[in-house]
């Protein structure tokens, strides 16, 4: 797959016609290559090449806050996007506050989805050798909670406040590094615990097991069922998620703590996004390549990809519509419907 990874070159070619698909070069940005969005975008590059649709040059290890803005501005053709980001952009809040409301709304309107998936489920974990005994152990601790800016950091701060009432800088010390340094930071003692996006099984967790056994804590059921968490679940790109511990994919070295046999947490949903001005036929062909490659490309890439909700169009899992400003690209809609899927009118 390395042949699909290269430094982004200038000149997004999203406006080229489908008649020259075999010659199209597209650029894409995504998160770390071992994450769900990282593997998903790399899988798209493979599926598109297999179908002779396009050559997609992928730059992994990016902060997706920047990547989504690059797509909106036409600087990049494709990006992995947690759906909270276009929402924050549309309101010019959080990492997009400097854009201003008018500019933020304008940029957010330039982004459309090809397909969706569950990026991760946010949770707390720590080495068994640490002094962390669960969510109540966060007070006064150093918590690695994501890159310096982006959806992961925003969600982690929100989740910690929901569980403990603590804010970064007052109740605990936040540690932020880019995704490329994540495993090193988990292993080197820079933080006491980690509130990060997880897949099941999670690549960062399994890689860090070389430094010792770990424990993952579910959200307490009382918090998961609370009105406060229900409000979190209404944020665009957030889907309350329950998963049987037995289905999380861990064997030795990892203990999952819950009141029952179920892990609970906020699922982060997003998808691959493009500029709304991408050529209809190109967007359609890319989406068709995705659909055709679901089993032999996407779900075959990593153990956790089979439960990441690729190929779903039910808004209960995609979190399209409602407060989510993102719609499917018209070309993507055509590909989905030709493949026999139903796309809700509110997502078109």
Positions of predicted regions on the chain:
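Ligand-binding clefts/hinges and TM-proximal coupling segments of bilobed small-molecule sensing domains
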Residues: 139-145, 149-158, 236-285, 289-312
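N-terminal segment of the mature folded domain
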Residues: 72-116
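Sec-exported extracytoplasmic/periplasmic mature domains
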Residues: 46-53, 72-76, 91, 129, ...
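Bilobed "Venus flytrap"/periplasmic-binding protein-like clamshell domains
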Residues: 23-57, 120-188, 199-202, 326-331
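Extracytoplasmic
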Residues: 23, 53, 63-66, 73, ...
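Gram-negative bacterial Sec-dependent N-terminal signal peptides
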Residues: 1-21
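An extracytoplasmic/periplasmic, membrane-proximal ligand-sensing/linker region
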Residues: 40, 198-212, 216-224, 228-231, ...
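Pocket-lining segment of extracytoplasmic ligand-binding domains
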Residues: 83-85, 92-94, 100-103, 130, ...
């Amino acid at each position: 797959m390395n042949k699909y990874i290269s430094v982004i070159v200038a000149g997004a070619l999203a406006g080229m016609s489908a008649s020259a698909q075999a010659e199209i070069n597209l650029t894409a940005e995504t998160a770390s290559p071992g994450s769900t969005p990282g593997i998903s975008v790399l899988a798209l590059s493979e599926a598109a090449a297999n179908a002779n649709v396009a050559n997609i040059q992928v730059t992994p290890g990016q902060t997706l806050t920047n990547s989504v803005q690059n797509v909106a501005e036409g600087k990049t053709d494709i990006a992995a996007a947690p759906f909270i980001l276009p929402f924050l952009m549309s309101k010019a809040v959080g990492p997009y506050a400097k854009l201003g409301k008018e500019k933020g709304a304008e940029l957010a309107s330039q982004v459309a989805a090809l397909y969706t998936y569950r990026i991760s489920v946010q949770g707390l974990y720590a080495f068994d050798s640490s002094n962390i005994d669960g969510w109540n152990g966060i007070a006064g601790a150093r918590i690695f909670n994501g890159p310096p800016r982006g959806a992961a950091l925003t969600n982690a701060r929100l989740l910690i406040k929901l569980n403990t009432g603590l804010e970064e800088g007052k109740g605990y010390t936040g540690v932020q590094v880019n995704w490329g340094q994540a495993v090193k930071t988990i292993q080197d003692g820079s933080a006491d615990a980690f509130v990060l996006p997880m897949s099941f099984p999670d690549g960062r967790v399994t890689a860090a097991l070389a430094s010792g056994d770990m424990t993952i804590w579910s959200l307490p059921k009382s918090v998961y069922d609370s009105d406060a968490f229900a409000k979190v679940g209404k944020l665009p790109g957030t889907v309350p998620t329950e998963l049987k511990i037995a289905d999380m994919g861990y064997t030795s070295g990892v203990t999952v703590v819950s009141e029952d046999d179920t892990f609970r947490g906020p699922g982060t949903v997003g998808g691959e996004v493009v500029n709304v001005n991408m050529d209809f036929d190109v967007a359609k062909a890319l989406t068709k390549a995705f659909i055709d490659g679901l089993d032999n490309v996407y779900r075959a890439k990593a153990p956790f990809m089979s439960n990441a909700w690729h190929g779903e169009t039910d808004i209960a899992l995609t979190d399209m519509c409602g407060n989510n400003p993102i719609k499917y690209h018209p070309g993507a809609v055509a590909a989905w419907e030709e493949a026999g899927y139903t796309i809700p009118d509110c997502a078109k």
